[in-house]
């Protein structure tokens, strides 16, 4: 569905992208055009190395997974009901507000790769996949969240979950 959202946004606002590119002498597919491509998917801040961006994604995804497990674990005494989804939503908003400027907080490969692929097809070309880096940056939002989710689950299971009474 994320790719569908990217397609819909492009269909609705494509002429505005073209106007912006013309007004700012921007060539689609250049490093400068990442500003517009980032509407569809995530790219790291220019000051971050690829390893730093991967580290950010691993940490924020592990925090998200650990807290999701804590909020949904039947053995920890947290009241169930509508509170867990609300708290998870607040957590995602806090993560986004605090780390969004660093990497765009992908936290989910599906949230990033499909829209990147669409941006590639819509004329941004290789810059959509590399993010202006020497390596294919699209790999980071695929692999780092997987590592982070596994790490968050393992940390919860072995440090917290094993001490719960159930």
Q: Language model features by range: what are they?
A:
Residues 1-166:
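Membrane-interface helix-loop junctions and terminal tails of multi-pass membrane proteins
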């Amino acid at each position: 569905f994320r790719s569908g959202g990217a397609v819909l946004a492009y269909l609705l606002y494509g002429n505005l992208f073209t106007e912006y590119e013309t007004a700012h002498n921007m060539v689609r597919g250049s490093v400068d055009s990442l500003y517009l491509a980032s509407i569809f998917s995530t790219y790291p801040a220019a000051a971050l190395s690829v390893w730093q961006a991967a580290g950010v994604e691993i940490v924020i995804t592990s925090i998200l997974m650990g807290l999701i497990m804590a909020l949904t674990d039947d053995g920890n005494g947290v009241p169930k009901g509508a509170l867990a989804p609300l708290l998870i939503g607040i957590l995602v908003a806090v993560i986004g507000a605090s780390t969004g400027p660093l990497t765009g907080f992908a936290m989910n490969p599906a949230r990033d790769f499909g829209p990147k692929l669409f941006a590639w097809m819509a004329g941004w070309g290789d810059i959509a996949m590399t993010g202006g880096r020497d390596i294919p940056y699209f790999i980071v939002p695929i692999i780092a969240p997987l590592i982070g989710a596994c790490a968050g689950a393992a940390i919860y299971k072995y440090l917290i979950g094993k001490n719960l009474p159930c």
